[in-house]
Amino acid sequence: MEWSRFDNYVVTDDKARIDFDRVFDWLSDAYWALGRSRDVMARSIENSVALSCLSPGGVQVGFSRWVSDGATFGWLCDVIVDPALRGRGLGTFMVESAVHHPFVAEVPLRLLATRDAHSLYEQFGFTVVPNPLRWMEFRQSSHQ
């Protein structure tokens, strides 16, 4: 699946077009992915619907991915734009493309986590979870 923007940027789910080194470098500096190894990153991409935002020349300028069963639940994560290109609407284009991806288009519950981009996601219907204390997490390192 591929979406195009007025200035010829595209978002694609073609994993063959991912510039893994660029994505890994960006995510290595992202607060939510610190310490994630190359192997873990590769497996996470392999086992999700990965979306790449590409410049008109085909250079990777953004990335995101869906983790979902395709029926009941979806988790949008690792949404990131090349730091040199932020503020140009590419994040908005990526999220718009992601929420319309056919793999999750009919999924009733789609979640994400953000520390600082609430206004971006609110444009597409995401809201703050009303009862966050109902959510729990399991971290492998804390249960060995």
Protein language model features and the residues they cover:
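Short helix-loop capping/hinge motifs at secondary-structure junctions, enriched
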Residues: S142-Q144
